[in-house]
Amino acid sequence: MSEFFLELFSEEIPARLQCNSRNALLESFQKLFEEKKISFKKSTSFSTPNRLIVLFEGLSKEITQEAEEIKGPNVNAPEKAIEGFLRSNQIDKKNLLKKKIEKGEFYFFKKPSKKINTINLLEEHAPLVLDKLEWKKSMKWGSYSLNWARPLKSILAVFDGKSLNFKFHHLTTSNTTFTDKEFEDEQKIFKDFKSYKIFFKQSGIIIDHNLRKEFIIKEFEKISNKKNFIIESNNKLLSEVTDIVEQPNILICKFDEKFLSIPKEILIITMQFHQKYFPTFDKKGRITNEFLVVANNKDTEGFIKLGNERVVEARLSDAQFFWEKNKSQNL
């Protein structure tokens, strides 16, 4: 049994597009394998901001295409129609047989059973699957005709440890991918998903979005227990930040306590909606001046923390100004 593993590397895809695209891509390949009667044991999809991945495990290396009887044109059809049928099936007229059915007498061709290698089938049909992938929002770039969420840079495609060979628009598949989105001259060969996953894990990148989400939740729990405060559960925001980052790092930030005079609801919407931050609350449900940021990197110098604190201070200054202005106006 074999493994099929595909990675589409692009510029950063917005979080709102990732979930639909990874599910749609997986379902399209599942449908292809079902139509072609290719069995598999397990299938899943993953995404990071730059990588869209599908994985099939326990795939058959080859399939047996069953014998079938293919109906052709009527025996009295024009010769051109008969020749077209012969060409499309790559047969001679001597291979045809006549059969009477309800609608008249027709030519038929008995197509014998044959074995087909799964790798050949993938090389033929994978580009068609990719072409049918629809995006809620897409773009074109350069002189290319491809519509994609963001510029597509490379396609890694491996079956049974071997690189698939097919073209998709301006790209040709290989068994390599970019290992650092910032430095696209750094590439590495991968022959299976296990080595791929381990490599990126060692680089601090969590390929599996479900594991990224679990990691963030566990870090929240650790911080909550240590600081003795409550982090409001917001699954929509949690899912969004999970798809924004690939190397999640939780930062505890603060804003000036003077902004606590602003109504809690305004503070929450300013942090959650505008900045994707997670506000914190004490045991009595009162909002605190500490908030959590899910960063996409280590903050060894403290610059990410400082930058986010400056941003939220500016946001809250605006919110305070408009709140005070509204209070001063009589209804």
In which residue ranges do the predicted regions lie?
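Long, basic N-terminal domains or extensions that often function
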Residues: S2-F273, F281
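Catalytic nucleotidyl-transfer cores of nucleotide-processing enzymes
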Residues: I231-L331
